[in-house]
Structure formats: C-alpha cells, structure tokens
Amino acid sequence: MTNMSNAISLDLGDDGILVATMDLPGKPMNVVNGDLMRPFADMVERLATDASIKGLVLTSGKADFCAGGDLDNISRIATAHQAFTVAEQLKAVLRRMETLGKPVVAAINGHALGGGLEISLACHARIVIDDPRLKLGQPEVKLGLLPGGGGTVRLPRLV
C-alpha cells in the first residue's frame, strides 16, 4: 500500500486494479482542497504513466465519499482570477482522469456532494451503497455558486 501525503492511500492488486482510498486527515469528511487534490492529481498521473495499472477504483475511508469544496478555503478566495484558477485546476485533473483510456469506478460509500459528486461524475462508472439517507447532489447552486469541476456538463449527459 502506498500513502500519498496521508490524504489518499493506494493499493495495487495483483490484477492491476489500483484501489485509491481518500481519507483526508484532520477533517470529519473528505473535502475538495489542495490537501486532497494535490495527491489526487499525482494519483491520476500515476494511473496515466504506469502500464501495470489496468484500472482504478476510487472510494473513501470515511463514512461519506466527499462533501465537496472546503468552505474555509473557498471563503479565502479573494478574486475572480483565483476562483477561475481553482476551478480550472479541478476541471483539468478530472478531465485527465476521464480521458485516460483506463476504466475508473467510483465506489460511493456515503454522501457525494458538490466537488465530491463532480469527482464521481468524472469516473466511467459509479457504484453506490443502498442507503436511503445517502445524498448525491450539487448544493453549491443554493449558494449562488456554479459547479466548478465540469459537473454541469457531465451530469446531464448521464441522466
């Protein structure tokens, strides 16, 4: 098992399937911030360059898959240019993962909201636990924010 800065652990099986478990330290839920997305981008790069990896299963070590954007980080964005840069970086890593040519499956074990849902939408398939309390959604629209990772394109394509 490989640990990517404690936020994502990787386990490559004998079958060539890489299991990536998001488990952001110090947070009750995984949130989309630099501490998660830097190792996420490194994981996507490894998926792209390591021929022994045949596919990826992405899941969470927490009770929920991912709660979306880190509101503390979002509140520190001071300019439109900064907001644009953050959104473009997220879109770029998700688009890279989506177009690699290797299958990526999100194993959604709890709520996937906002950026967490966008991560799962960039996967080729999603498997969701059967729990009537589980929520998938983009609640940022209620705050006047647009989904920044490409979810406005991917979600309608799936529905």
Please state what every model-predicted region is.
Residues 60-93, 112, 142-144:
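Glycine- (often His-adjacent) and acidic-residue-rich active-site loop
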Residues 1-59, 77, 92-96:
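Conserved CoA-thioester-binding segment of acyl-CoA-metabolizing enzymes
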Residues 61, 96-143, 147:
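Glycine-rich beta-to-alpha active-site loop
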Residues 20, 39-40, 58, 70, ...:
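Terminal peptide-recognition signature
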Residues 152-159:
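Hydrophobic, secondary-structure "cap" segments at the distal end of domains
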